[in-house]
């Protein structure tokens, strides 16, 4: 993944509703979900959901496939994995990113 693709993907995920849509699709796995199912699950109006899905497709994070009269949206798991690899490529100077021995993890943070 190059920098411009990473920026596009991160930009698409930098909006709350789109992040929730993407997480729901990742949770659904390869079978994906229809817009109606996503709308009901996330309580997002159809027109708003359509806009967010278009942005996720444009960023390469989601694919859309017509199945008869329905559209199925699926997470582009390869793209997600490329993004994670891009973000961690230079993590910890090439060493495993694990805490030093003997340290205890602190409480789970909800923000960075």
Pin down the residues of each PLM region.
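Amphipathic alpha-helical dimerization/coiled-coil segments
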Residues: 1-5, 23-27, 77-112
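N-terminal helix-turn-helix DNA-binding core of bacterial DNA-binding proteins
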Residues: 4-45, 67-79
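Base-recognition residues in the alpha-helical recognition helix of bacterial helix-turn-helix
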Residues: 23, 50-52
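Divalent metal-coordination and catalytic microenvironments
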Residues: 49, 56, 73
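Conserved catalytic-core motifs of GNAT/GCN5-like acyltransferases
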Residues: 65-67, 97
């Amino acid at each position: 993944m190059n920098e411009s693709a990473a920026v596009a993907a991160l930009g698409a995920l930098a909006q709350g509703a789109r992040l929730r849509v993407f997480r729901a699709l990742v949770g659904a796995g390869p079978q994906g979900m229809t817009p109606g199912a996503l709308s009901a699950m996330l309580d997002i109006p159809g027109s708003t959901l359509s806009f967010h899905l278009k942005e996720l497709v444009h960023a390469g994070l989601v694919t859309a496939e017509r199945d008869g009269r329905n559209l199925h949206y699926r997470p582009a798991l390869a793209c997600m994995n490329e993004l994670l690899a891009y973000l961690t490529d230079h993590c910890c100077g090439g060493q495993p990113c694990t805490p030093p021995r003997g340290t205890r993890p602190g409480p789970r943070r909800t923000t960075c």
